[in-house]
Amino acid sequence: MRTLKSLVIVSAALLPFSATAFAADAIQEQPPVPAPVEVAPQYSWAGGYTGLYLGYGWNKAKTSTVGSIKPDDWKAGAFAGWNFQQDQIVYGVEGDAGYSWAKKSKDGLEVKQGFEGSLRARVGYDLNLVMPYLTAGIAGSQIKLNNGLDDESKFRVGWTAGAGLEAKLTDNILGRVEYRYTQYGNKNYDLAGTTVRNKLDTQDIRVGIGYKF
């Protein structure tokens, strides 16, 4: 009986230490709470935009009388469009209008370009802050020929295609660089009784800045 009483007293004395050790083990066995992961916000290209561009063109005007004339030029204008986005695919429509200062003479025949514009489809791939894209559509330009005796100006319609890279500079400001090839086909001009056939091809590099709504 005395032994049993001693055992009860010893067990009661050790009980707080056992509870403390068990609590410590329970605390240590809890898995650590992972730190929250910060996810960068995904930029959306969807919506409307407008902007300005400045470019330089390498042109080739083939004529039936004096051969090829190369009226390289500076050009400037404005663009506007609307994008739709599905996952990482961005697609939409864009138009531009501007002025080309292309003008050059050869053997008495002058070729001069003026207003130019286009209406195109665009498709790009969203890389979050940058978007490479392809574009193609119809183009138009005012092209004038002058042989010193007479001149004639015609609005020419052709096609254009190109590629570019657009980048997000701020939440609403976009920057871009674009290459475009445009062909206006063949057209006859009547200059003082002489028929001059002309074909104009242009290659442009354009840089632009835009505002996304």
Swiss-Prot record:
The keyword DNA repair does not apply. Its main location: membrane. Pfam families: OMP_b-brl (PF13505). The keyword Membrane applies. GO terms for cellular component: cell outer membrane. It is found in: Cell outer membrane. Keywords: Cell outer membrane, Membrane, Signal, Transmembrane, Transmembrane beta strand. Residues 1-23 form the signal peptide. Gene3D superfamilies: 2.40.160.20. InterPro entries: OMP-like, OMP/PagP_b-brl, OMP_b-brl. Belongs to the Omp25/RopB family. This is 25 kDa outer-membrane immunogenic protein.
